[in-house]
Amino acid sequence: MKFTLSWLLEYLETNASLEEITDKLTHIGLEVEDVIDNSRLTGFIVAEVLEVVPHPNADKLKLCKVDDGSKILQIVCGANNVREGMKTVLASLGSTLPESDFTIKPTKIRGVLSEGMLCSASELALVQEESEGIIELSDDYKVGDKFFNCDPVIDINVTPNRGDCLGIYGIARDLAATGIGTLKTLSIPQLTSSINSPIDVEVTDGESFISGIYIANVKNQESPKWLKDRLESIGMRSISAIVDITNYIMISFSRPMHAYDAKKIEGELTVRKANDGEKFAGLNGKEYLLNKDISVIAGDKNIHGIAGIIGGKCSECTLETTDIFLESAWFDPISITKSSRQLGISTDASYRFARSVDPEFTFDGLNLAAKMILDLCGGETSSVVSAGSLDSADTKVSFDYQDVNKFGSVSVSPDEVLDILTKLGFSIDKKTEGNWNVQVPSWRPDVTIPADLIEEVTRIYGYDKIKEEPLPNNVEEVDSTYDNLRILMTNRGFHEVLTWSFMSESTAEKFGYSNKLFIIDNPFNNSFNIMRPSIMPNLLQVTADNIAHGISDLAIFEIGPIYDGEAQSKYVLSGIRSGNNLPRNHYNTDRKVDVFDAKADCIAALEFFNVNCDNLTIEKAEKEHYHPGKSGTLSFKNKVAGYFGELHPNILDLFDIKQKVVGFEVILENIENLPVSRKKFIDYKYQSVKRDFAFIVNKDVEVGNIINVIKKSSELITEVLIFDVYHGNNIEPNKMSIALSVTFCSPIHTLTEKEIQKESSAIVNLVCENTGGTLRTYR
């Protein structure tokens, strides 16, 4: 957003310097990107040549008497086109040429003193190629005036929520709220109509508002110098007085407008949706193919504009235009954004409409522009015609001013809070001492909650005044806990991955998450249109990508948030194994991962938090993405701690995975709430001993029961792991062989072989008694 200092001062009463103003702009969030200070161009003056005589000592030079508006100067000039009575540009003494950085000084040229220089266009960097002769100005230029607009130009970066600051008046309002100056009161003219508008308006797209004034008998012409200078200084091309006035109002008040040549409009103007395949010729000389999602402004025969984006060539205002229809409208920001992207058109108008313009300034902007047109071009006006409904939200926010200091970490008095909000245009009803009812102004649709008001006050009060506050200690504790959990998983052979927090709705539904999905209103990609309800689909995609690159043995995990339909996130640990597991010994190097690996990983994570897994029950997994017969849910009294199991073949098919994959999920936020006893830490100083058992049991025996029986058989047992489940030769069809590794250790002495044998016999007896099984091997 560019504007000149003098333009700003039309709306802001202040004695602040340029540097003070730009510093304050950056401090309140309107970051200054550039300041173009043209003060070095003040020495270039409009001058008139009064007399031209030959140089006494040079045939190709001339001696000129030049009037600069204050005195008569003697100038030596070599231009062929210099003549008496012409107006040109004088580089006065002390000025520096922009093209060469040459400073003008009193100089004797062939023995005659020259008190300045008459300039060509190339010497002033107005053209790239070298020009012949000096600049010849029209009679409109006044002798003594500065040739260049030397007004400093300020360029600020406006955030998307501040559409009001895409107008200079909005910027002035923010500056006034800081105390740097006073916002000048805006006087809105009241026009008297003398004719009826032959053009009526209508809205059928269901989302727009349009108003307009018919102005007859205008004399469109070149804009006056002050208006041209204003627009050209910020990079806008002057076109004609009528068009320039609409641009002037847009830059001043963030109020886009459009002027139609009224004689080129047939019937009424209707804001409607385009038909698929309709064509439109824009003012930029390009033709566009439209569709039914784009709002247009059309007459009976032609489309005269794409709503809020660009006008049509068919009703363009020219210097021959005598009657105009001046439009001021409001269009839906989302609709404008989508249409602009579809068509690949970005204009000053669409940029503002997409960020929302003030709906309540629609008529005020129309009157201001119409009054300027009457002043500069003459004419007579109709009354205002309008159609549609204005989307002017009546937003009120309940606000406790004490929250500014509480959450903003500043010290602002209630009177200061009231003063800042009032200067920003908010109106306050003091309901109680602490609770205010704040009416949000129509130009601030981004302010909807108390936090927005806190931001507004702290922004104007000064972000540099915010006190430093230490972070809560619990943040460090949580981070440290998760870091240690990551170390545990790494020690178990896993690699950590980080995946998107988004996924597609269709993928979630295939995993059984059809309810309570958190839909993203404006996703950057249709494949990422919901917040993920599970990390497992993302891990499977990573697994599939690795398998496609030849990496089939994989163990990956992620710690991160998942989301339900109310946008409540909870942290989980999810992991996946596929392919070969780490070999148990050098005789068994190609063991495939199985459900017990996933169970062991899940239990290891729970035991990391000192959960006594002996008290957890194992039930059938309720998640649809697990194999129903090879999975489980770890819980205690309906409080889920985690899930584990082999991934369902149908799920693997979605990712084109042809090998077995197992996974687990630990609900980290449930762990601290699990009503289970905590394991007491025992420092085992003495050597542990392992023994392996293999039992033949019926296939319907739950493996978890065998583990629980073994763990309860002795206090010397520290770990029980399953490392093999076998069906096949030498085993009856309804039987299976379960192989387990049991670790013994005493906290007070090294175990003897006799003690180990006694504990092992107790294990065999209890397992056979509780399962009806038999011992197959022991070693």
Swiss-Prot record:
Species in which this protein is naturally found: Wolbachia pipientis wMel
SUPFAM superfamilies: Anticodon-binding domain of PheRS (SSF54991), Class II aaRS and biotin synthetases (SSF55681), Nucleic acid-binding proteins (SSF50249), PheT/TilS domain (SSF56037), Putative DNA-binding domain (SSF46955)
InterPro entries per the UniProt record, alphabetical: aa-tRNA-synth_II/BPL/LPL, B3/B4_tRNA-bd, DNA-bd_dom_put_sf, Fdx_antiC-bd, Fdx_antiC-bd_sf, NA-bd_OB-fold, Phe-tRNA-ligase_IIc_bsu, Phe-tRNA-ligase_IIc_bsu_bact
Gene3D superfamilies: 3.30.56.10, Bira Bifunctional Protein, Domain 2, Ferrodoxin-fold anticodon-binding domain, Nucleic acid-binding proteins, Phenylalanyl-trna Synthetase, Chain B, domain 3
Bound cofactor: record note: Binds 2 magnesium ions per tetramer.
Residues in B5 domain copies: 392-468
GO CC list: phenylalanine-tRNA ligase complex
Name used for this protein in its record: Phenylalanine--tRNA ligase beta subunit
PANTHER family (alphabetical): PHENYLALANINE--TRNA LIGASE BETA SUBUNIT, PHENYLALANYL-TRNA SYNTHETASE BETA CHAIN AND LEUCINE-RICH REPEAT-CONTAINING PROTEIN 47
Signal peptide coordinates: none
UniProt entry tagged with the keyword DNA-binding: no
